[in-house]
Amino acid sequence: MKSPKVGFVSLGCPKALVDSERILTQLRTEGYQVASDYDGADLVVVNTCGFIESAVQESLDAIGEAMSENGRVIVTGCLGKDEDKIRQMHPNVLKVTGAAAYQDVMEAVHEYVPAPPRHNPFVDLVPEQGIRLTPKHYAYLKISEGCNHRCTFCIIPSMRGDLVSRPVGSVLEEAAALKRAGVKEVLVISQDTSAYGVDTKYKLDFWNGQPVKTKFYDMCEALGQLGIWVRLHYVYPYPHVDAVIDLMAQGKILPYLDIPFQHASPRILKLMKRPAHSENTLDRIKVWREKCPNLVIRSTFVVGFPGETEEDFQILLEWLKEAQLDRVGCFTYSPVEGATANDLPDHVSEEVKQERYERFMQVQQEISAARLQKRIGQTMTVLVDSLEDEYPVAVARSYADAPEIDGNVFVEDIDKSLVQPGQLLEVEITDADEYDLFAKLIQIKTA
């Protein structure tokens, strides 16, 4: 008897990607095969995103394509919170579940495509680290679900609930399993990484027979013992983050912080109801860089938030010039269905939003280009992601570059028979532009 096949479409952020990996791992553990196309699937699971309107539309389109090509579709993920919207467009989907509803998805799969009988998991082995949708050399490590904050532009808590931290022993064991599987870089993700453990009152757990608190610093310290790259994402600048900078300065974890500042005007931050908005971030960034001169800071910002005046925007630009952040993303404000910011007065016109976005990006491009120019002549360690098809070039990243959202280091004139994805290289930086670096190979690192 052939094993049933399940097709899978994964949309959205890295946190949703981890949800997809978990569902796929459970499917494979139970003996289901993963179909490579719609035609070969007994049903299709679509893991959706519902954060902004464009993501909602992409999710609805993906559901429609799966319905058209296959006809038997289970919908999960953040958009699943709005079942009425999904069924209004696609009334014949088999089942709709919410975000991180792993058991609900599996029950729906069991209902419509029963698991194969007499499946022996010891014969059809699933790798210890589970099924991964990322390249073999890096992986996302989700440490918690949900968020306790109620930012006015965000509906994540209504989709994923309040903060629920994973036991630290479970987090560390997963990270160790990833290392054993050959992963060179772990990217720590959640909705609010630096709040990790608050909901458990920093409960004591165990890993390798040693007591470890379910706490941001303690987790980072333990991850730093693994001897692989550890990159922190979605870190809010609470006061206790300062201690983690010491771990970066000691080389225990990558000196890289992804902090979503979102704005710099105190008035706009108050309207956004941002956590930690009262902290003097410029002074703290200065102290962080004194402690750890190699620190790279990435952030995201929103321009055109309801009520944003030209004065507020100028405060943001001046803050940006002083902060000298390394990596920055910017978005124009987009109303999200269900977000309380929609009810704020004085919405900014699309024309003004776009004009401010362009001014913002021009300022940041100059900052980014200047900071990257300083890298020329430096020796850096980079991790190879891929090789270019037509040229002897390795597409790599340094500690300063997260996959997909930051720049690359292009290592030129390599021998493709010697350089492979997942290898660490020692390189010399030879050139730079606004976002990327160019380098020549010094040596392939063996450890």
UniProtKB/Swiss-Prot annotation:
As cofactor, the record names: [4Fe-4S] cluster
Question: Does the record bear S-adenosyl-L-methionine in its keywords?
Answer: yes
Q: What Gene Ontology cellular-component terms does the record carry?
A: cytosol
Function, as annotated, reads:
Catalyzes the methylthiolation of an aspartic acid residue of ribosomal protein uS12.
Which residue range or ranges hold the MTTase N-terminal domain? 4-114
Q: Which residues make up the binding site for [4Fe-4S] cluster 1?
A: C13, C49, C78
**What's noted on cofactor binding?**
Binds 2 [4Fe-4S] clusters. One cluster is coordinated with 3 cysteines and an exchangeable S-adenosyl-L-methionine.
Q: Which Pfam families does the record match to this protein?
A: Radical_SAM (PF04055), TRAM_2 (PF18693), UPF0004 (PF00919)
Q: Which UniProt keywords apply?
A: 4Fe-4S, Cytoplasm, Iron, Iron-sulfur, Metal-binding, S-adenosyl-L-methionine, Transferase
Compartments annotated for it: namely: Cytoplasm
- Biological source species: Acinetobacter baylyi (strain ATCC 33305 / BD413 / ADP1)
Name the family: Belongs to the methylthiotransferase family. RimO subfamily.
Q: Where is the TRAM domain?
A: 373-443
User: What processes does the entry annotate via GO biological process terms?
Assistant: tRNA modification
Q: Where does [4Fe-4S] cluster 2 bind?
A: C147, C151, C154
Q: Which reaction does it catalyse?
A: L-aspartate(89)-[ribosomal protein uS12]-hydrogen + (sulfur carrier)-SH + AH2 + 2 S-adenosyl-L-methionine = 3-methylsulfanyl-L-aspartate(89)-[ribosomal protein uS12]-hydrogen + (sulfur carrier)-H + 5'-deoxyadenosine + L-methionine + A + S-adenosyl-L-homocysteine + 2 H(+)
Q: Which SUPFAM superfamilies match?
A: Radical SAM enzymes
Name of the protein this chain belongs to: Ribosomal protein uS12 methylthiotransferase RimO
- NCBIfam families per the record? 30S ribosomal protein S12 methylthiotransferase RimO, MiaB/RimO family radical SAM methylthiotransferase
InterPro entries for this protein: Elp3/MiaA/NifB-like_rSAM, Methylthiotransferase, Methylthiotransferase_CS, Methylthiotransferase_N, Methylthiotransferase_N_sf, NA-bd_OB-fold, Ribosomal_uS12_MeSTrfase_RimO, rSAM
Question: Which EC numbers characterise this protein's activity in its record?
Answer: 2.8.4.4
**A GO molecular-function descriptor:** 4 iron, 4 sulfur cluster binding
The Radical SAM core domain covers 133-370
